[in-house]
């Protein structure tokens, strides 16, 4: 019997509720699986600022480093504003300190019964299935910058974006690895702005070199980021496969993609520090949605967090059977109409969590 250690950092507002449901599901899996989970709870974001004065306490970071994976709820809220110390700084710092260089965001439909919820026509989005692989610890978000008040005349501000061949190489290898998990391998789309930006030209050249020398069996196509943004609205399935792009472009394009399934409450994400080639890469898992400070208690959709746990089971905890069962359980629950208000349902957060926990326990028990 193996024990997997998970550092839980709920963060702010709905973060605690969604993490509670994720833990509920993992405890249900424990009942019918040889794997056991140990949970270590720590602070991040606004909750950490209130308690310690900093958005990422040292003890949180050390706990994360000594665990098999990290489960994050959500950070931020108007209470903490945009001052010098902000909740989001904790998220950026933990990504950097843990070297979580690859962010994976799937965009698909857990169930075809959700197609009608998309803001796009069902016939346009049906069959959409891609994963955005976003470089997460480089680029403009981590480049040198100058605030307006720091300039000599108080009339300018700037940020810099920089990528090295090494940084582009490792994110390309991650995209290739994800593509090779399928038979036949998935196509790869590399998004850049090579017609304007020098770093995009380095990006494109490096991607081509890595793909041609290390993964000649894979198909890679380059697409300008603005063109890809249009395709995503007009015909999203055209980008099916694996999308690889830089930090800022990935942030924007994955947020655009997040509205396709109809609710941010459906979309999981993983941030990895290495290739999951042994299904045991260290990673941080979180829903794509924010902290929803205006949402009443017990109303948030926990599905994105629960599906993030499924990714954790597959990529970090080497629990492939449990991951598949959990994804199947989520589909069954949604098909049964047990949904929160964002999916035109009337169920509460806890009711959805209870239903998924019961479903995954039953699926695993029947599979013994």
UniProtKB/Swiss-Prot annotation:
Keyword Oxidoreductase: yes
Residues given in the record as Mg(2+) binding sites: 226, 251, 255
UniProt subcellular location: Cytoplasm
Cofactor note: Binds 1 Mg(2+) or Mn(2+) ion per subunit.
EC number: 1.1.1.85
InterPro entries named among the record's database cross-references: IsoCit/isopropylmalate_DH_CS, IsoPropMal-DH-like_dom, Isopropylmalate_DH
Pathway the protein takes part in: Amino-acid biosynthesis; L-leucine biosynthesis; L-leucine from 3-methyl-2-oxobutanoate: step 3/4
Site entry: Important for catalysis: 141, 193
Residue ranges of the TM segments: none
Catalytic activity: (2R,3S)-3-isopropylmalate + NAD(+) = 4-methyl-2-oxopentanoate + CO2 + NADH
Record SUPFAM superfamilies: Isocitrate/Isopropylmalate dehydrogenase-like
Keyword Metal-binding: yes
PANTHER family: 3-ISOPROPYLMALATE DEHYDROGENASE (PTHR42979:SF1)
Similarity remark: Belongs to the isocitrate and isopropylmalate dehydrogenases family.
Function per UniProt: Catalyzes the oxidation of 3-carboxy-2-hydroxy-4-methylpentanoate (3-isopropylmalate) to 3-carboxy-4-methyl-2-oxopentanoate. The product decarboxylates to 4-methyl-2 oxopentanoate.
Protein name in UniProt: 3-isopropylmalate dehydrogenase
Species of origin: Kodamaea ohmeri (Yeast)
